[in-house]
């Protein structure tokens, strides 16, 4: 990997805090002039390196601002009601299952919550094994939102309570003000 790639990786890992010039010079084993030249020659399609005092930060280019604002708006719309969170967890742990299966588990009509989850792209309805009713399953977006690679990565009852609490607090953080 070249120095541009290493610098980009370091700044990406450091996140919003960035890295102090001294740290970069030490890690990259180069002079200040070499670092300045490296940054001046840095080019990425959507990223740039900015200096704030003696700290360097990997940031997005200003031209991407409107697209980033759209993404942030979409993410803010991902908030879920308590009912939708409950239905989502039922589907995640028991998939595939039908709407009637969810109603049996919850003892209440869940159509509103299911429609919300489908509309937000967290759940999809599919015909599984030629069954008469559509079966609900989680999507790749669900995996992405909850930071897991596959459904088997969901916490199980055998795992630490802390891990379960962390997963469900992530769900609670998605809670919106609307009730389904």
Curated annotation (Swiss-Prot):
Which gene name does the record give?
Answer: scpB
Share what the entry says about its subunit structure, partners included: Homodimer. Homodimerization may be required to stabilize the binding of ScpA to the Smc head domains. Component of a cohesin-like complex composed of ScpA, ScpB and the Smc homodimer, in which ScpA and ScpB bind to the head domain of Smc. The presence of the three proteins is required for the association of the complex with DNA.
Tell me the organism: Staphylococcus aureus (strain MSSA476)
Please state which protein family the record places this protein in.
Belongs to the ScpB family.
What this chain does, per the entry, is described as: Participates in chromosomal partition during cell division. May act via the formation of a condensin-like complex containing Smc and ScpA that pull DNA away from mid-cell into both cell halves.
Cellular localization per UniProt: Cytoplasm
Listed InterPro entries: ScpB_csome_segregation, WH-like_DNA-bd_sf, WH_DNA-bd_sf
Q: Which keywords does this Swiss-Prot/TrEMBL entry list?
A: Cell cycle, Cell division, Chromosome partition, Cytoplasm
* Keyword Transcription part of the UniProt annotation: no
This one is known as: Segregation and condensation protein B
Q: Which residues form the signal peptide?
A: none
GO terms classed as biological process = cell division; chromosome separation; DNA replication
């Amino acid at each position: 990997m070249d120095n541009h790639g290493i610098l980009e990786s370091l700044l990406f890992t450091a996140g919003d805090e960035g890295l102090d010039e001294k740290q970069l010079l030490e890690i990259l084993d180069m002079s200040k002039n070499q670092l300045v030249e490296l940054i001046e020659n840095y080019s990425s399609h959507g990223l740039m390196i900015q200096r704030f005092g003696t700290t360097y930060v990997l940031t997005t280019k200003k031209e991407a601002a409107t697209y980033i604002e759209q993404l942030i708006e979409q993410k803010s719309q991902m908030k879920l009601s308590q009912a939708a969170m409950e239905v989502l967890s039922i589907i995640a742990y028991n998939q595939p299952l039908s709407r009637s299966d969810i109603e049996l588990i919850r003892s209440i009509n869940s159509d509103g919550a299911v429609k919300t989850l489908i509309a937000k792209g967290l759940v999809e309805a599919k015909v599984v094994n030629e069954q008469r009713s559509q079966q609900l399953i989680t999507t790749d977006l669900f995996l992405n939102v909850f930071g897991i690679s596959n459904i088997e990565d969901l916490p199980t009852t055998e795992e630490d309570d802390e891990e379960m609490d962390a997963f469900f607090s992530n769900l609670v953080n998605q809670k919106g003000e609307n009730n389904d």
